[in-house]
Design a protein with these regions (language model features):
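A structural feature that tracks compact, well-ordered secondary-structure segments
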Residues: 10, 16-28, 35, 40, ...
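Residue-level marker of regulatory loop/turn positions in helix-turn-helix DNA-binding domains and
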Residues: 49, 53, 81, 131, ...
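Leu/Val/Ala/Ile-rich N-terminal alpha-helices, chiefly Sec-type signal peptides and the beginnings
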Residues: 3-13
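Short, solvent-exposed interaction modules
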Residues: 62-113
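Acidic (E/D-rich), amphipathic helical modules within compact regulatory domains
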Residues: 20-70
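Long, low-complexity intrinsically disordered regions enriched in Ser/Thr, Asp/Glu, Pro/Gly
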Residues: 76, 154-159
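Alpha-helix N-cap/N′ positions at the starts of helices
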Residues: 2-5, 83-87, 137
């Protein structure tokens, strides 16, 4: 999945307005224009779509954590230059104040049944022997589960 698609899915799953996305960036001490957010959210087939970089998505996710959980005193975390699906899943889990059991419940909503041990493998450090790489499909399923949990009457996100 592209960063643009991930941002669109997050927006759809949590029913976020563009202004709320801009506010998340502000919480990470970065200002983005409404036009830039709108261009990130456009379908990749649209010529005015602007490709979102890993670092930009990392800034959004860090700001989203601050927005949802409260900003910590002191220096803000530096945004990662390269993001993995595992990092994105972890940041979303933190922002949404979820424990491993909550993630399992969200995945169960979309028919994915994992054990606590299996889900824990996605939250380990990459050099851990039990680390498991989060594939696009699992991240997509997680976001669909979040959507159906937060917006039970919504339809599956298709684009």
């Amino acid at each position: 999945m592209t960063n643009n698609e991930i941002l669109r899915r997050i927006q759809h799953a949590l029913n976020l307005k563009n202004a709320q996305i801009m506010k998340a960036f502000e919480q990470a001490e970065v200002t983005v224009a409404h036009d830039k957010v709108a261009n990130w959210l456009k379908d990749e087939s649209d010529k005015s779509c602007v490709k979102m970089k890993d670092q930009e998505l990392a800034v959004f996710l860090n700001g989203f954590i601050n927005l949802k959980r409260g900003k910590k005193d002191g220096e803000q975390p530096k945004p990662e230059v390269t993001l993995t699906n595992n990092m994105i899943l972890m940041k979303l889990r933190i922002a949404l104040d979820m424990k491993a059991e909550d993630v399992l419940d969200v995945l169960e909503v979309v028919g994915i049944n994992l054990s606590k041990y299996e889900i824990g493998a996605y939250f380990r450090k990459p050099n851990n022997k039990n680390y498991k790489q989060c594939e696009d499909q699992l991240l997509c399923d997680f976001l669909n589960g979040v959507q159906f949990t937060n917006r039970p009457d919504s339809e599956e996100f298709t684009g």
